[in-house]
Amino acid sequence: MVVQYLLFSNDKNVDPTNLVLRQDFLHQKCLLISVSNSSHIFHEMLSFRNVRKDDFIIEFFSENNVCSLDNCIAKKIHYLSDINTFDMLLSLDGEYESLIKWFISVNYFEALQNYQHLVKSLSLKTDLMFYAVSKNVSIDVINFLIDMDCKCTIDSITRAIAEKKLDIAKIIIDHNPSENIIHESLYCLSYEKQKDLFKYVLENYKIDSRYYHKSLIYWMINKDEEIMCDLLCRIDIKEFSKEKNISSYVIQSNSLNVVKTFVEHGLQFNPDIYLWVNGNSESENIVRYIIELGIDYRPHIDRLLKICITSGTFSHLEYLINLGVSQENINEAFLTAVSEDKFELIKYLIYMGADINYKNTIAASYTDNIDVLKYLIEKGADITTGGSNDVINHAIGSHQSDFCRCLLENGATITLDDRDELMVIYRELTNGCSYEDDDYEDLDQLTNSDLRNLIHEEIMNSC
């Protein structure tokens, strides 16, 4: 039986004049539709994803299943750049939703204009704007869909914002600035940190002030003081302060001005507010302000000291210690300073009485900095950790030769007794060479004690 086919392709794949394939695989590069067996031409065009508006359609007949174009009889070539081609296709497939979506997906503005009666009909039942936003469409297509009274939904706007298509989002918002649209747009712009468009919407459209609450929370998390202050001028701060967990968001704003504004409007804190403090200079000013308000800092002093140390802020660390801290607080801060290699803070905390062997744990185990190690040894650190020598054993396993040599020179002893571990360490220290080339015939004959001695020798002799 002779079957009519439509072959969608381009001249990279098919020679349309001679009906010759330029590629080996027909179905991978071209869309082949049997007209007799399919009434969903447009759906297949859309699903194939590779049909473009500069492609052509070869209409031909074949008696057998088509695996190549040999023995096929071409009837006509239809170019998709010719609008009349779609009249022919519509005569074969009256389901035009996929066709309109294909026009949108390939930015075929002229075709959309030509079939605007179909666009208007379809827009009543399908969210064409949302579909357009999900594609890489031009502004002309967006404006055309608006002119065709296509719905501008919240989903369309949030999709555009999420995909950073802010020019499209702005057009859609301007076309449908309902209170709900503005509310959701501001919220989504806050979440996506799109400051410029947020400011545009804020300045050009007014909504009930309670709708600003969710946006303000996100700008607090974003730490944008300019936007926060603008929104604070537009809301009832006392009403906003009733929001759940608002104290934590106020602190996360990282703005002393914002914190003071809320306190002036009656917001009160409890000691757990210190859990939301960040490690930077502005947060330190906020901490001092909250302490001056009388909020007890002592339940969270270890955390506050740790933040000072990790951020390397000497003045704030000194401020907190001068307020009054326990010996244990100083010791914990000291271990943090060692682990962070903050030399000046280590010196200061030792001066303030930090126990260098706090909890029978050598502080040296908290660092891999050779200068810090030497300083700790100078100040009396127990590098043998009560005889267990955990520090040297750990350092050897981490391949820190200079660090290990310093420990061995100051009395540490290698006590590892796992043979496999000793063998691995020794071979790595000798770059995989066996000791049999020197004094021993077979490395496997060495005792654990021999291996420890060899490792000690390799470390001490390393450059």
From Swiss-Prot:
Q: What SUPFAM superfamilies does the record tag this protein with?
A: Ankyrin repeat
* One Pfam assignment: Ank_2
Q: Which InterPro entries match?
A: Ankyrin_rpt, Ankyrin_rpt-contain_sf
Q: Which domain of life is it from?
A: Viruses
SMART domains in UniProt? ANK
Q: Which stretches are ANK repeats?
A: 124-154, 156-181, 242-271, 273-299, 300-328, 329-355, 356-385, 387-416
Which keywords belong to this entry?
Answer: ANK repeat, Repeat
Q: What is this protein called?
A: Putative ankyrin repeat protein R579
